[in-house]
Amino acid sequence: LELSQFRGGMSNPTFMVTDGAEKRYVLRKKPPGELLPSAHAVDREFKIITALYGSGVPVSKPYALCEDESIVGQMFYIMEFQDGRVFRGVDLPELSAPERAEIYDNMADVLAALHEVDYTDVGLADFGRSGGYCERQVRRWSQQYEASKTEDLPVMDKLMAWLPENMPDDSLTCLAHGDYRLENMIFAHGSADILAVVDWELGTLGNPYSDLAYNCLPYYAPDPRRGNLIENNPVTSGIPSEENYVARYCKARGLSEIPHWNFYLVL
């Protein structure tokens, strides 16, 4: 066997394994050292990939989960290797405008497909709490901010007051990726087809619109490593505006709009 480590996906170290017949696999494991009990849960990743394999959501074929830490030092799992492309920059400078448009359309469609999965039918009813996701997020991060702040920031106090007062219906529940972004997809060579969505370590039962809002952050927030879409011109770039990207997602799910969209962006 030959082993080489991938760039990226480093929260849980990821390796390519090549056997004597030149067949390639992916090994993903917990990092070494002392860890929080709920952190780096590769068994949860394996469970969600196993549940989704064969559905309308593209994931790599799961092969085996090994919980015996004596084998490689930590729990790990093996899945199929996807020979494809990973794009780091959200503006896709290496592609043409029509290719960019198709990439973003497919990304929106796959997220919509994920949120349409009946998590009970695929055996993930116990994968998280049903309902109350936004309330838990507001409470948790407000507590984190209060515990770690070093100075008073009136704008944060205003935000923490605004969120609970403007919280929408919090009963919506779906299977959420938690880190759905361009970099966490493997695309086919020569086409915009998504071979697999990867890095499921934050997957849980959550709110679909919060998952979508996270995916739309490049339209608002600069990122020194991945770039942004703050000044995106859809006419020349081929990349849809945020409004049209969200509309594509809505169309795929049969929705007319996302109510309280600003709330999810702020959250």
Task: Give the ranges of each region predicted by the language model.
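A generic structural signal for secondary-structure junctions
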Residues: D83, L92, E146, L202, ...
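ATP-binding pocket architecture of kinase catalytic cores
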Residues: E2-L175, A188-D193
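All-alpha amphipathic helical-bundle segments outside canonical DNA-binding/catalytic cores
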Residues: G128-R129, S256-L267
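Hydrophobic side chains within alpha-helical segments
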Residues: I48, L182-N184, Y214, N244
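Catalytic-loop of the protein kinase fold
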Residues: L175-H177, L182
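Catalytic activation segment of kinase domains across protein kinase-like and atypical kinase folds
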Residues: I186-R226
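Glycine-rich "substrate-gating" loop/helix at the edge of Rossmann-like oxidoreductase active sites
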Residues: P98-R100, W200-N207, V235-T236
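Active-site activation/catalytic loop segments of kinase-like enzymes and analogous catalytic loops
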Residues: S210-G254
